[in-house]
């Protein structure tokens, strides 16, 4: 019988990254996955602190948040239609034995899936997905293309500009913060700080 440690290792961050890389050649999609991972992982740290988890439980929670974020769009490059994404990917994850919590969160991040967001990781993924993409776009229009120059006020101003980053659903950003039970400006600032701390990992 496989031990819990061995099983966890089989579905850890390294394995998630390998699967993402196998299915996704686009560097921008890989960077998006990493940006979402950074934001969702920061939410995971805050949740672990709130729950006062011991080291073992904390590690498990953070692994779940990181892997869920990395894999949320792993099938998008091959299956970008609403009929296929994220359903094809989730079926593959089920075949490979990835945890139910991860698969449910990935289904839930797509509004059209009909899967409700119940757990904190479900809500964190939805709240960070579109926002991470928007924050990246805000950084890339800066002369230095550095997220260090992006501030909350500037992000809110850009959100009102419908011509900017048209692909980002502003309503999802607003709804995501509401579902997490946090103020929108606070959530934007929280994700900005997380991305600024690890900017080198995503080329910003």
Language model regions located:
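Divalent metal-dependent phosphate-bond-processing catalytic cores, especially two-metal-ion Mg2+/Mn2+ enzymes
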Residues: 25-30, 36-57, 71, 122-204
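Acidic/His-rich, divalent-metal-binding segments that scaffold phosphate/diphosphate chemistry
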Residues: 1-82
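Divalent metal-dependent catalytic cores for phosphoryl transfer on phosphate-bearing substrates
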Residues: 58-162
């Amino acid at each position: 019988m496989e031990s819990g440690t061995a099983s966890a290792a089989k579905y850890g961050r390294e394995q998630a990254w390998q699967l993402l890389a196998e299915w996704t050649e686009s560097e921008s999609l890989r960077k998006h996955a990493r940006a979402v991972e950074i934001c969702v992982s920061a939410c995971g740290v805050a949740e672990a602190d709130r729950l006062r988890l011991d080291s073992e439980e904390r590690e498990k929670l953070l692994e779940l948040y990181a892997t869920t974020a990395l894999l949320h769009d792993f099938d998008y490059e091959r299956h970008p239609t609403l009929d296929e994404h994220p359903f094809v990917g989730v079926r593959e994850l089920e075949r490979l034995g990835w945890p139910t919590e991860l698969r449910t969160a990935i289904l839930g991040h797509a509004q059209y899936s009909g899967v409700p967001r119940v757990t904190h990781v479900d809500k964190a993924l939805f709240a960070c997905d579109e926002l991470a993409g928007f924050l990246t776009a805000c950084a890339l229009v800066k002369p230095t293309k550095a997220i260090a120059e992006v501030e909350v006020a500037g992000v809110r101003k850009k959100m009102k500009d419908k011509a900017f980053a048209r692909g980002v659903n502003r309503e999802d950003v607003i709804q995501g913060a509401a579902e997490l039970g946090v103020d929108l400006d606070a959530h934007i600032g929280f994700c900005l700080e997380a991305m600024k701390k690890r900017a080198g990992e995503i080329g910003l």
